[in-house]
Amino acid sequence: SYAHALRYIAQFVPLYLATSLSMQQARRKLGKALFSLFEGGVFADGGLLVYAGQNRCMPVELLLDINEESAKITAHSYEGQVYKYSMLVYDKEERINILSRLKEKPYQVFYKPPLITVIHKDVDKRKGVLHICKALAFPLDQVLVVGNSLKDWEMMSVVSHSCAVMNAEPLLKERARYTLNPDRLAAFFRFRE
């Protein structure tokens, strides 16, 4: 399983998570035991970076003109700064209305009905990975980035070692240098000893 794979890899190299989830969502999804294997990460597509006891939060302006009766809004924050908004909007007309108003703002907006997500306009996973690698002096030719979605390719392509998980989108598996098979992990990761 991937949980066993992560536990195994964490014995040899530092792990960092890169996800579109907020840090709180990632902690809930992975569970405390798995989340604690990561030394930090890129959260909310780069809205929050956590590494080596430091953080960089890219705040998002307050959403003032959204009717909270028509949208369930969750503000994801770190030390009092909101770095991601998630909105569940079930009414199609209201979604269209909200999306048109958000396009006028300096945000990145992601939309997958009924969910609308808002983050800072200047962040992404690629920039987050590059920032952490530079801050921690990780040579890019010694970094492995694992992804499961074609949206991860931009982040994966900046390092020498890219890896798709077994159930990744087929095009990502074609582009990635490796495919991660958790059943073969012990042989795969011995290069770091």
Predicted regions and their residues:
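Hydrophobic/aromatic beta-strand patches that form the interior of the parallel beta-sheet core
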Residues: 16, 42, 144-146, 163, ...
